[in-house]
Amino acid sequence: MVGEEKMSLRNRLSKSRENPEEDEDQRKPAKESLEAPSNGRIDIKQLIAKKIKLTAEAEELKPFFMKEVGSHFDDFVTNLIEKSASLDNGGCALTTFSILEGEKNNHRAKDLRAPPEQGKIFIARRSLLDELLEVDHIRTIYHMFIALLILFILSTLVVDYIDEGRLVLEFSLLSYAFGKFPTVVWTWWIMFLSTFSVPYFLFQRWATGYSKSSHPLINSLFHGFLFMVFQIGILGFGPTYVVLAYTLPPASRFIIIFEQIRFVMKAHSFVRENVPRVLNSAKEKSSTVPIPTVNQYLYFLFAPTLIYRDSYPRNPTVRWGYVAMQFAQVFGCFFYVYYIFERLCAPLFRNIKQEPFSARVLVLCVFNSILPGVLILFLTFFAFLHCWLNAFAEMLRFGDRMFYKDWWNSTSYSNYYRTWNVVVHDWLYYYAYKDFLWFFSKRFKSAAMLAVFAVSAVVHEYALAVCLSFFYPVLFVLFMFFGMAFNFIVNDSRKKPIWNVMMWTSLFLGNGVLLCFYSQEWYARQHCPLKNPTFLDYVRPRSWTCRYVF
C-alpha cells in the first residue's frame, strides 16, 4: 500500500514536470478568474471556492507526502543506529559481547539484540517518553493527567470540608500502607550487604581456584550449591519471613519483596555472565582470570538493568535538575494513586460490601473497576519504568535508557510482553528462554515459552500473595491461561489497527478484573476475620462466603 501511494505521488509530480504547457494553460484561466471584472469588484464567492479547492488538493497530497518522508526518516534512523551500535560508544566496552564485524546482515535497530551467544547490546539512548514529551501534542496528554490530579485533590478537599466542616489534610491510607518503615530500611540493608558480599566472594573463590583444582567439577558443584543455598535460603526465605513475622502493611511489603526479587535476578546475572568467561580462560590456559572488580559489581547492583556487563555506555554529566524532576513525579504518582483509591475505589467497595456475593455484584464491580485500574496501570508504568529508573540512570550516568518500548502501539500480546518492561524481558529472554533452549534443544521453542510464562506467573503471584497476606490466583489464571493463549492466537502477524483496539480492550478489562477481585478479597478478610485460621483459610477465597456484619 505504501509503495503504491509513493508511486502515485511521484506520478503526479512527474506529470506536472512533463506537461508544463498544460499546467500553464490551466493556470491562465485561474488567473483570469481572479482578475477583477469590468465593474472593478472581485467575485468573493469564486475566490472562496478556489481557496477551498486548493486546500482540498493540498490535504489530498498531505498523507502521501508524510508517509514518504516518514519512511525515509525511519530508514535513516535505523541505519544510523545500526552503524553506531558497531562502535565502542562512550566507553561501552563490549568485550566478548561486542558485535561481530564484517557481517552482511546487521541486527535491526528496533530490537538491538545480539545473537544469543553474545548477549544484549547496550548503547546510549534516551527513554521513549523523554523524546515524545518534547512534542507539544504528547505533552498536552501529560498536562491532562496533571489537571485530573488537581481535580481529584479539589474533590477530596471539598467533600471533606462539607462532611467535617474543616479541611482534612490527613493521608491515613498512605501512612498505613507505608507503616513500620524502619523495619523496611534495616531489612533492605541486610539484603543489599548480603547480595553485595556473598555472590562476589563465592564467585571469586571459585574462579581463582578452578584452574588450579585437581577436581574442578566437584569444586564447581560445591560453590554452585552454596550459591543456591544463598539464593533460596537467605535471599529467598529471609525477607519473606520478615514481612510475615513483623506483619508489615502492603506497601512496605511490596518494597521488600520487589527488592528481594531484584537482588536474586542481579546475583544470577552476575554469576551467569562471568562463569563462561572463567571457563573459556581456563580452556585457553590463560595466565589471568577474568574476575570483575568490586566497583564494577557494586555499580551493577544499582544500575537500572538486570544484565551484567563490566562496563556500560556512560553519559558525560549528571543533570541534577532532571533527577529531582523524576523523583518529584514519582511522589506525585504516589499521591495520584492515593486519591484514586480515596475517590474511586473506596466508595465503590463500601457499597459492594452491603450486598452478598453474586454474579450481578461481580460484573458491576469489574466494570466499575476498569477506570481506576487503568489509571493505576498508567501511573505504575510512568512512576517506575520511566521516572524511577531514569532517575537512577541519570545519577549513575547510565546511558542506555530503553527501559520500555512503544507497548501502547502493540497489535499483539507477544509484542506487548516484549515492549512493556524491557528490563525484566531481557532477563527472561537470555537467562530463562535462551538457556532453556541451550540446555534442552532448540526444537522446543513452545516449551521454552511456556516455561518463561510459568516462571513469570509464579513470581508475580508469589509477590501478590505475600504482600496481600492471602493467596488468590486471579493474576496467575489471567497471565498463565488467557495471557499465554492470546500470545499464540494474537501473534505478530496481526498488524491491523483493530488488533490494537482489541489489545487495549482486553488490557482494560483485565485490570478491572484484577482490581475488583483482589479488593473484594481484601475487604472480605478485613470484615470477616477468623479466630484460628488454618493453612487452607489462607488459600480459600473469603469473599465468596463472607457476610458483612455492621
Swiss-Prot record:
Keyword field contains Transmembrane: yes
TM region(s), chain numbering: 139-160, 181-206, 219-244, 253-276, 320-352, 370-395, 444-468, 475-490, 497-528
Comp. bias intervals (Basic and acidic residues): 15-34
Region annotation Disordered: where it falls in the sequence: 1-36
Tissue spec: Expressed in most tissues, but most strongly in the adrenal gland. Expressed more strongly in liver Kupffer cells than in hepatocytes.
Binding positions (cholesterol): 137
Alphabetical keyword list: Acetylation, Acyltransferase, Cholesterol metabolism, Disulfide bond, Endoplasmic reticulum, Lipid metabolism, Membrane, Phosphoprotein, Steroid metabolism, Sterol metabolism, Transferase, Transmembrane, Transmembrane helix
Subcellular locations according to the entry: Endoplasmic reticulum membrane
Positions contributing to an acyl-CoA binding: 415, 418, 421, 425, 433, 445, 456
Motif FYXDWWN motif, chain ranges: 403-409
Lumenal topological domain: 161-180, 245-252, 353-369, 469-474, 529-550
One of the protein's GO biological processes: cholesterol metabolic process
Domain of life (superkingdom): Eukaryota
Main subcellular location of this protein, as a coarse class: endoplasmic reticulum
MF (Gene Ontology): cholesterol binding; cholesterol O-acyltransferase activity; fatty-acyl-CoA binding; sterol O-acyltransferase activity
Active site per UniProt: 460
Catalysed transformations (reactions): a sterol + a long-chain fatty acyl-CoA = a long-chain 3-hydroxysterol ester + CoA; cholesterol + an acyl-CoA = a cholesterol ester + CoA; cholesterol + (9Z)-octadecenoyl-CoA = cholesteryl (9Z-octadecenoate) + CoA; cholesterol + hexadecanoyl-CoA = cholesteryl hexadecanoate + CoA
Known function: Catalyzes the formation of fatty acid-cholesterol esters, which are less soluble in membranes than cholesterol. Plays a role in lipoprotein assembly and dietary cholesterol absorption. Preferentially utilizes oleoyl-CoA ((9Z)-octadecenoyl-CoA) as a substrate: shows a higher activity towards an acyl-CoA substrate with a double bond at the delta-9 position (9Z) than towards saturated acyl-CoA or an unsaturated acyl-CoA with a double bond at the delta-7 (7Z) or delta-11 (11Z) positions.
Description of how the protein assembles with itself and partners: May form homo- or heterodimers. Interacts with UBIAD1.
Membership in a protein family: Belongs to the membrane-bound acyltransferase family. Sterol o-acyltransferase subfamily.
Name this polypeptide is given: Sterol O-acyltransferase 1
Species in which this protein is naturally found: Chlorocebus aethiops
Gene transcribed to yield this protein: SOAT1
